[in-house]
Amino acid sequence: MRNRTLADLERVVALGGGHGLGRVMSSLSSLGSRLTGIVTTTDNGGSTGRIRRSEGGIAWGDTRNCLNQLITEPSVASAMFEYRFTGNGELAGHNLGNLMLKALDHLSIRPIEAINLVRSLLKVDALLIPMSEQPVDLMAIDHEGHPIYGEVNIDQLAQMPQEMLLSPPVHATREAVEAINQADVILIGPGSFLTSLMPLLLLDELTQALRRSSASMIYIGNLGRELSPAAAALSLQDKLTIMESKIGRKIIDAVIVSPTIDISGVKDRIIVQQPLEAKDIPHRHDRELLRQALENTLQQLNGADSV
């Protein structure tokens, strides 16, 4: 890849979950259908968790969040999709978008078809692919050897777990593997390290695709301290080491982090360290600043390729 900008890229793939993936995708929404998000589907908290306990299926919350952030044309449909019930009734706290996705899942052959129907309804061009279309939860073995089930409990761990795994073992969505295979650039993060990023790296098909990929890979760091005590204790280099040990080789070419992040120990990678925080929401990436940082990173990768 030489002297190319974001606008020149044929395929950009972003991996993650929560608010982080939506923020990245909305900053790159001008890429349209050339942008693909691979979304974590292990959430078991909030409205999503209640739906899963009642109806089963994959976690829809992170996908809904991404779709919300990709809406560029406000409409009755988008207002409905973003609506959250209030009050004290059984629907209180539920997001209508989650319920719509679950209903469409019942009507569709595959969850990805439900997502595509909503994308069409909301006029979202970017592609969204669940990491797996099979119901799955995150599980960890804590430092004392005890099994810990579910994202909510894992986020409360005081120390890093000995092991993380998916329960039950599931397959990656085939379109997710194909997207990685075709990508020019792959973005990882931002997001909760243990519960938004690591689940993706527990899928063998995805890690194999990442290991084979010749795409430039960029890790985007969080802006604020992680709520998870275990993840908050990790340095930037710790996170890179853990991710690459799961993937099986050193693949991350560049990192984008804020000026407050300690980059000590990070070697042999391009480091782009510049202001990224939005003024209106603490610890959230400003879309334009993030896009500028990505452009800056691409230019440095271009320079490294030409050496």
Curated annotation (Swiss-Prot):
Keywords on this record?
Answer: Cytoplasm
Locations listed in the record: Cytoplasm
User: What domain of life is recorded for the organism?
Assistant: Bacteria
What are the GO MF terms of this UniProt record? Answer: LPPG:FO 2-phospho-L-lactate transferase activity
Q: Biological process GO annotation list?
A: regulation of cell shape
Q: Does the keyword Coiled coil apply?
A: no
**Gene3D superfamilies given in the database record:** CofD-like domains (3.40.50.10680)
**UniProt cross-references to CDD domains, sorted A to Z:** YvcK_like
State the GO CC annotations.
cytoplasm
State the function annotated in the UniProt record.
Required for morphogenesis under gluconeogenic growth conditions.
Q: Which family does it belong to?
A: Belongs to the gluconeogenesis factor family.
Name of the molecule in the record:
Putative gluconeogenesis factor
Taxonomy, top ranks, is: Bacteria, Pseudomonadati, Pseudomonadota, Gammaproteobacteria, Enterobacterales
